[in-house]
């Protein structure tokens, strides 16, 4: 059974799935695993016939913890400020929205219907006030839970609330000295003494307490989260104890997921600068392919993401799944993977093979010429709008992530390759049979193989000869498609020119 269907198979009644993030930096491809895992679980619950709601929490009350690599050093004065109270790096609006808003657009494009809720609104509208009052009154019990599970002693008076200093603006430099509903009395390292109203966005709970408080206030029943939270002694271990013993609720059904690794570099973290923003990757791959990247791998396994050649391989794999799905020759898990990947069920194919399109856009410059060549290479009716979208993805990928061995440029007529006797023999033999061959990609491919066989040489050597003549490299795109799209007249004329120039 597919992992999401297995996770929800025993659930009854209405469900609320929650995911979230602290918008401290660019929300990246690695973060997509959480929200897409949540979305797939949400859709699995709906498929079971249960009512469901899906929320995405933006923790904009979290403080800026340091000056990250992508920030100017002038942001040092904002360390400790809530993210919602810091100017945006681009000078427009606030810091948290600067990173959240592009991600909301990614959510829309990838078919994620989650309601976005800002934590500052939960505090500001008093939604968490009851939970705060409860944890403040029962702080000694919470202290015991934290110490037993984490193995770390908490020194001095413990109040599970962090007031926002009304003087210096920091939320990480205050200490509560007394509490009487609804006010937490505090002092700040800046020297200020004041009172914070727990019914307003005048402070926040520490993460280990805030998380179960959200479960309680929002009635969360399912939540995926990363393995760091799910580790022994981690925040889920403390959260479920607080949920049961302090709030009297069952903790959400957990689904722990592994990280997405940037191939050859490690886990993605916006705080280290090792990350690809989700808003950027959605420009180089269709949203369905991003969903497929997540859906096809059980959350318990990490994902190696390679935006270079690996993206082409991922596209190939996706097309294989789609073909089997269309033909009805597919197992249950693979069928589920495709159905949870698709945004529109009618979109069961892409206009043209992505690798082939990468070749076309390097041969032709104008979209109209690419469209004409694409139409000539398939018997299927092409959706022009969908093809133009795919052209956009292909061009962006070629510009940003394509390895050098995929890129090529046609040699000009005066850039003639130096040919060996073997090269000349291969090209001459190809010319001999070219008049009688059908000019399609499969026939061209077979002909080059047969030429190599007739001359007693390996096919790789024959292919290299053609790449040398047309792009000045030893390797290149799939030769049959490549020569087909160059056209028979152009191909034959170029070969004759090169042979004549080296005679």
Swiss-Prot record:
Domain of life where this protein originates: Archaea
Family recorded in the similarity comment: Belongs to the class-I aminoacyl-tRNA synthetase family.
Alphabetical UniProt keywords: Aminoacyl-tRNA synthetase, ATP-binding, Cytoplasm, Ligase, Nucleotide-binding, Protein biosynthesis
Chain ranges for the short sequence motif 'HIGH' region as given in the UniProt record: 23-31
Reaction equations catalysed: tRNA(Lys) + L-lysine + ATP = L-lysyl-tRNA(Lys) + AMP + diphosphate
Gene Ontology cellular-component annotations: cytoplasm
Organism: Thermoplasma volcanium (strain ATCC 51530 / DSM 4299 / JCM 9571 / NBRC 15438 / GSS1)
Motif 'KMSKS' region: where in chain: 267-271
Localization per record: Cytoplasm
Lineage: Archaea, Methanobacteriati, Thermoplasmatota, Thermoplasmata, Thermoplasmatales
GO BP terms, alphabetized: lysyl-tRNA aminoacylation
Full protein name: Lysine--tRNA ligase
InterPro entries: aa-tRNA-synth_I_cd-bd, aa-tRNA-synth_I_codon-bd_sub2, aa-tRNA-synth_I_CS, aa_tRNA-synth_I_cd-bd_sf, Lys-tRNA-ligase, Lys-tRNA-ligase_SC_fold, Rossmann-like_a/b/a_fold
Listed GO MF terms: ATP binding; lysine-tRNA ligase activity; tRNA binding
Gene (name only): lysS
Enzyme Commission number: 6.1.1.6
PROSITE patterns found in the cross-reference section: AA_TRNA_LIGASE_I (PS00178)
Keyword Secreted: no
């Amino acid at each position: 059974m597919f992992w999401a269907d297995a996770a929800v198979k025993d659930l009854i009644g209405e469900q609320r799935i929650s995911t979230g993030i602290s918008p401290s930096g660019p929300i990246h491809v690695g973060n997509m695993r959480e929200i897409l895992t949540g979305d797939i679980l949400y859709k699995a619950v709906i498929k079971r016939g249960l009512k469901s709601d899906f929320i995405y929490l933006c923790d904009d009350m979290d403080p800026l913890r340091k000056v990250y690599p992508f920030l100017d050093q002038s942001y040092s004065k904002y360390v400790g400020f809530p993210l919602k109270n810091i100017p945006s790096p681009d000078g427009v609006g606030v810091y948290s929205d600067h990173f959240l808003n592009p991600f909301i657009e990614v959510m829309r494009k990838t078919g994620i219907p989650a309601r976005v809720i800002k934590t500052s609104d939960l505090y500001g509208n008093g939604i968490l006030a009851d939970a705060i009052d409860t944890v403040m009154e029962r702080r000694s019990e919470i202290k015991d839970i934290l110490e037993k599970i984490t193995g770390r002693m908490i020194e001095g008076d413990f109040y599970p609330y962090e007031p926002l200093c009304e003087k210096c603006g920091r939320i990480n430099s205050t200490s509560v000295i007394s509490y009487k509903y609804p006010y937490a009395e505090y002092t700040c390292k800046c020297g200020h003494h004041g009172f914070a109203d727990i019914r307003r966005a005048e402070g926040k709970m520490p993460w280990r307490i805030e998380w179960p408080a959200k479960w309680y206030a929002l009635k969360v029943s399912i939540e995926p989260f990363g393995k760091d939270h799910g580790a022994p002694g981690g925040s889920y271990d403390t959260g479920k104890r607080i949920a049961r013993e302090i709030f009297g609720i069952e903790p959400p059904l957990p689904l722990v997921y592994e990280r997405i690794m940037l191939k050859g570099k490690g886990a993605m973290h916006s705080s280290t600068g090792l990350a690809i923003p989700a808003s950027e990757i959605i420009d180089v791959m269709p949203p369905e392919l991003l969903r497929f990247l997540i859906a096809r791998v059980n959350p318990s396994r990490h994902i190696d993401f390679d935006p270079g050649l690996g993206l082409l391989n991922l596209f190939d794999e996706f097309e294989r799944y789609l073909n089997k799905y269309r033909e009805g020759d597919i197992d249950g898990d693979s069928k589920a993977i495709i159905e949870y990947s698709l945004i529109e069920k009618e979109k069961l194919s892409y206009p043209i093979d992505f690798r082939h399109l990468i070749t076309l856009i390097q041969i032709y410059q104008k979209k109209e010429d690419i469209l004409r060549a694409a139409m000539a290479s398939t018997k299927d009716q092409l959706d022009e709008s969908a093809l133009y979208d795919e052209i956009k993805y292909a061009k962006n990928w070629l510009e940003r992530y394509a390895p050098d061995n995929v890129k090529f440029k046609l040699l000009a007529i005066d850039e003639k390759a130096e040919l060996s006797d073997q090269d000349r023999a291969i090209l001459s033999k190809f010319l001999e049979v070219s008049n009688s061959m059908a000019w399609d990609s499969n026939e061209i491919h077979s002909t080059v193989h047969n030429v190599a066989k007739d001359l007693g040489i390996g096919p790789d050597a024959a292919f290299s000869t053609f790449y040398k003549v047309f792009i000045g490299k030893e390797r290149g795109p799939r030769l049959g498609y490549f020569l087909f799209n160059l056209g028979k007249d152009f191909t034959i004329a170029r070969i004759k020119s090169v042979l004549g120039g080296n005679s």
